Amino acid sequence: MATRTQARGAVVELLYAFESGNEEIKKIASSMLEEKKIKNNQLAFALSLFNGVLERINEIDALIEPHLKDWDFKRLGSMEKAILRLGAYEIGFTPTQNPIIINECIELGKLYAEPNTPKFLNAILDSLSKKLAQKPLN
């Protein structure tokens, strides 16, 4: 049985494919997750994350951008965007504790992105979580 960490990794892969221009991924997300042995509760969890990000993608991007400082969101790599979007969605719209989300995103950055990416992800998501702690979305 897959773990939540594995489910998040699979969601990042789906978001990466979507960001890379594969809009068909929305239609086949469930079957792709099942191919990765993401089933039952973890499948529902992964699909809720994937669909949640896509439903609120513009809002999520707007949440991330002020925390980028000297970076332009459009110039970020697709994998960095995928991980940041997942993290920002979970921080803003799910009950999962922020330190868990940030740690998971750092680990995903180590697995999928460039060597400096985990520090970058940590800085952005930590800043976002502190802002939302002061002024929650809901």
Curated annotation (Swiss-Prot):
Q: Which family does it belong to?
A: Belongs to the NusB family.
Q: Which Gene3D superfamilies match?
A: NusB-like
* UniProt keyword annotation of Transport present: no
Domain of life per record: Bacteria
Its biological function? Involved in transcription antitermination. Required for transcription of ribosomal RNA (rRNA) genes. Binds specifically to the boxA antiterminator sequence of the ribosomal RNA (rrn) operons.
Its protein name is Transcription antitermination protein NusB
In the record, what terms sit under GO molecular function? Answer: RNA binding
What are its GO cellular component terms?
A: cytosol
Q: Name one GO biological process term.
A: transcription antitermination
Which Pfam families does the entry link to? Answer: NusB (PF01029)
Q: Matching CDD domains, A to Z?
A: Terminator_NusB
| Alphabetical keyword list | RNA-binding, Transcription, Transcription antitermination, Transcription regulation
Keyword presence, Transport:
no
Origin species = Helicobacter pylori (strain G27)
Q: Which InterPro entries match?
A: NusB-like_sf, NusB_fam, NusB_RsmB_TIM44
